[in-house]
Amino acid sequence: MTHYLLAVHGPAEMEEFGNYGSREEMEEAFAATAAFNDKLRAEGYWVFGGGLQSASGATVVDGQGETPVMTDGPYLETKEAIGGFWVIEAPDLEVALRLAAEGSKACRGKVEVRPFDGLA
């Protein structure tokens, strides 16, 4: 089994209801995402998952020099950012892509699928 990152992309800066048009739409997406999370757990794919706060609250840490440098804000200035993610364990890419499509429908966002490069 391989671990995959399913990264949900959305606007870097969130509006009042995230990337949803209304509170109702946001609540529907959250409920659908919770049901999808339950499915991942029940079927044994779930490793970890979560939503992220706005990219403007990020801090970039560069510890390559003698003294770490910490910079407020996202690493890259961009219109989109990762708003949440799942780490799943799946037998192959085909299954990971199928699950990503289900997750995309549930959260109403684009999902990028990337296999992990081995396990640490």
Regions found by a protein language model. Give the residues of each.
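Conserved, structured core segments of small domains
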Residues: 1-120
